A protein has these predicted regions:
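Sec-dependent signal peptide recognition
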Residues: 2-9
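C-terminal motif of bacterial Sec signal peptides marking the signal peptidase cleavage site
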Residues: 12-15
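Conserved functional acidic sites
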Residues: 24-252
Length: 252
């Protein structure tokens, strides 16, 4: 699966508001819109330890192996141990950090890095997030990142303004070995937004569920009418398969 959790210091937790480009997932809510329930997002985004010790997810594209350290979460995409998506986490947030550049070269990658906030400039979700439609929301004005052709050779880029939201819970039937009406949360990641956090040209959705972690990912682009076009890339992770790998990294 070649999904790009494409790269987003001022970070603001904001109250829910009306956005001219509706970003809600195309799903039916199952809870009251004013729900105040909070969710441990690390446990929703990662396969449970009892499963991940000997299993991984597979589906319509590449496999997905979950590995954890005390401060990093790896989604490894092949049996070779790379490429990967690497998220950082602490008691406050889970942060997008590293994704691949060349699937065949672990010394090439894209990494969020800000002159002011270092590697913590793109919080994806609060560590403990509020549910809702939407629930927790984060606005990011500094989306600085680096494109590395080698460990120490890189160019600097940015994604414009970014807004990340948690939506749900929902009930989804995603096929494969997953149960019907699986309870999910949807992380909406919108980037290349204008300075008002509107007209975000790109939107990605991470659909996560216990005890599996990531069960669906999709990308949409903003249409000329100001609404999001149907997904142009969708991947399902709906099979639990035996086997685990250790991430292979060369530069971090």
């Amino acid at each position: 699966m070649r999904y790009l959790p494409v790269f987003a210091l001022l970070v603001f937790l904001v109250a829910c508001g009306v956005n001219p480009n509706p970003a809600n997932p195309d799903l039916t809510p199952i809870a009251k819109p004013n729900t105040t329930q909070t969710y441990d997002m690390l446990s929703w985004m990662t396969m449970s330890p009892t499963l991940s010790s000997g299993h991984h997810m597979a589906g319509t594209a590449n496999p997905l192996y979950t590995t954890m350290t005390s401060s990093r979460m790896y989604w490894t995409k092949t049996q070779a141990g790379y490429p990967w998506d690497v998220q950082l986490f602490d008691k406050n947030f889970i942060y997008l950090w590293v994704t691949e550049l060349d699937w065949k070269n672990p010394r090439s990658f894209k990494v969020f890095h800000s002159p002011t906030l270092g590697k913590f400039n793109l919080p994806l979700v609060p560590r403990w997030a509020k549910g809702g439609y939407p629930g927790s929301s984060i606005k990011i004005s500094d989306s600085s990142y680096e494109i590395h052709s080698d460990c120490n050779t890189f160019v600097k880029k940015n994604l414009g303004h970014v807004i990340n939201e948690v939506w749900g819970p929902y009930k989804e039937s995603l096929g494969g070995q997953l149960p019907n009406n699986l309870e999910t949360l949807v992380i909406s990641y919108r980037y290349t937004c204008d300075p008002n956090y509107s007209n975000c040209f790109n939107k990605e959705e991470y659909h996560v569920a216990k005890p599996y972690g990531l069960v669906k990912w999709q990308h949409q682009s903003l249409g000329s009418d100001g609404t999001y076009n149907p997904p142009d890339n969708v991947t399902y992770f709906n099979h639990v398969v035996s086997g685990q790998v250790s991430p292979v990294t060369a530069c971090f």
